[in-house]
Amino acid sequence: MNYLPIFVDLKNRPVLVVGGGHIAVRKIDALLKAGASVKVVAEKLHSSLQSLTDEGKVEWIAKTFEANQVTNSYLVIAATDDNALNQLVFETAESQQRLVNVVDDQPRCSYIFPSIIDRSPVQIAISSGGAAPVLIRLLREKLEALIPPNLGAMADIATRWRSAVKTQFPQLTQRRRFWEKLFTHQSFQRLTENHQIEQAEALVEAELHNNNPVLGEVSLVGAGPGDAGLLTLKGLQTIQQADVVLYDALVSEAVLELVRRDADKVFVGKLAGKHSVKQEDTNQLLVKYAKQGKRVVRLKGGDPFVFGRGGEELEILKAENIPFSIVPGITAALGATAYAGIPLTHRDHAQTAMFITGHLKPDGNRLKWETLAQGNQTLVVYMGTIKAAELSAELQKHGKPSDTPVAIISNGTLPNQQVQTGVLSELAELAEKAPTPALIVIGEVVKLQKDLAWFGKEAVQFVSTQETLWQKPTLQNKETHWKQAA
């Protein structure tokens, strides 16, 4: 972080601006909005700046710059086209330990002005530290369109009612739920949009004395296969509204970073053969937190309804009359294979894709090997590495060719993703070397992986020339390269 983002109270504080042209006018405009006492040094003034001086809003203190003008200044701005003068202002301010900004000259700035989206009292400041001002301008335009104009009115009302809400709801969780409910209330939004402030405040008072108990709820959210960019928009919104997040071992650190900072995060992870938290205990925690009136998220790797025991957890919640919702996620069979360059279906290789788990309940039904061994299909096995030897043997026993292509994708979609490929007879050996969590893919589509890999260390390397002529890819030292045409 090259700059510390801070908001400064400039009300009635002296700010020195050296320069009287149109650039100085833009800066002075912002300073006046912040309540600063602006003093200008310039040989002559821009017409609009002259008007501000005539109105007594700005003080024109001198035509030439002197070092003593900096002494009592809170901030200093140099906004001239005279490079030597700008340098003098910068050096003088630095020597007196005053924060100084030389406009459009980043090396001579001890502070910079961000781009501002103003919905006072709500303000959003964005900056690239001077690296890409055009990019920041485009971003600001998008944010201006996204952020409602009534945000300031909503914040003003919240300021006036903050003390009363704190008295009515002494617990932080209660207050948070009240404000979230109010700010998303359609009538409240409509009234503030229409500048009907008295009616909006009447609605606040009515909601404040609404004695209906706050019901807890549980949302099952699919965290996706690992890459935080694959988390759905609704999933992101839900985890940022949660009071408590119960997460498992397959949820990546990048996704956990997106959880609201003050939410309680409870690990309820389990790995095949290494249960650290029993499923029954997880179920009871969901019930417990929901009955405390909290907004609970059960955050699961992949999709909650694909080998995630989501159905089992919802049955418990249903029995306890606890409201629930489901936010689907991208399951590993879709995300990891896509990042590995393995299409699940292909007209030449597979017309069916089948997902199975290698981690069955001890008393569960056996797999239908005859069905799994059929051709023209892709078989994806979750949590299957510890059963790789049995999987390989049974599939071959039931007619699957021993040279059927297989892949094991470890840490799919993450920067440390690894893809090992081989044939069915080698599956057990490959599984022993594969880091977990891992996904097994069996089928002819695996043949395409070397040509279609695009992510991570195994990605196809495209080597360009001016002619952009290419030959087919060849394998060299177990890496895929595109050979430049002669």
UniProtKB/Swiss-Prot annotation:
EC number: 2.1.1.107, 1.3.1.76, 4.99.1.4
GO molecular function: NAD binding; precorrin-2 dehydrogenase activity; sirohydrochlorin ferrochelatase activity; uroporphyrin-III C-methyltransferase activity
Pathway: Cofactor biosynthesis; adenosylcobalamin biosynthesis; precorrin-2 from uroporphyrinogen III: step 1/1; Cofactor biosynthesis; adenosylcobalamin biosynthesis; sirohydrochlorin from precorrin-2: step 1/1; Porphyrin-containing compound metabolism; siroheme biosynthesis; precorrin-2 from uroporphyrinogen III: step 1/1; Porphyrin-containing compound metabolism; siroheme biosynthesis; siroheme from sirohydrochlorin: step 1/1
Keywords of the record: Cobalamin biosynthesis, Lyase, Methyltransferase, Multifunctional enzyme, NAD, Oxidoreductase, Phosphoprotein, Porphyrin biosynthesis, S-adenosyl-L-methionine, Transferase
Lyase among keywords: yes
Gene3D superfamilies listed in its UniProt record: Cobalt-precorrin-4 Transmethylase, Domain 1, Methyltransferase, Cobalt-precorrin-4 Transmethylase, Domain 2, NAD(P)-binding Rossmann-like Domain, Sirohaem synthase, dimerisation domain, Siroheme synthase, domain 2
Protein name, as recorded: Siroheme synthase
